[in-house]
Regions:
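Short amphipathic alpha-helical interface segments
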Residues: 1-37
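Short alpha-helical interface patches
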Residues: 24, 28, 44, 58-59
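A short, conserved structural fragment
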Residues: 40-50
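Short, Lys/Arg-rich nucleic-acid/phosphate-binding segment
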Residues: 49-53, 57
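Short, amphipathic alpha-helical interaction segments positioned at domain boundaries
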Residues: 7-8, 56-65
Length: 65
């Protein structure tokens, strides 16, 4: 679980202020399969055509700084 929390922090850094960055999205997709599945299951990430995207409205709601 601690590894998953650390990866949430990485995602938070990549998508800071809710701005989606295509280059950073590629880095997010490098997470191991189990972590991506867990994030998708938590509805923080959505997976489309093998690419991983942040569910920005949920991100903005949960992680507003």
């Amino acid at each position: 679980m601690n590894i998953l929390i650390n990866k949430f922090k990485v995602i938070r850094y990549f998508i800071k202020n809710g701005i989606f960055n295509e280059e950073k999205a590629i880095e997010i997709s490098k997470f191991d399969h189990n972590t991506i599945d867990a994030l998708v299951h938590s509805q923080l990430l959505v997976q489309v055509d093998g690419r991983v995207y942040l569910d920005k409205p949920l991100y903005d709601y949960r992680y507003k700084e």
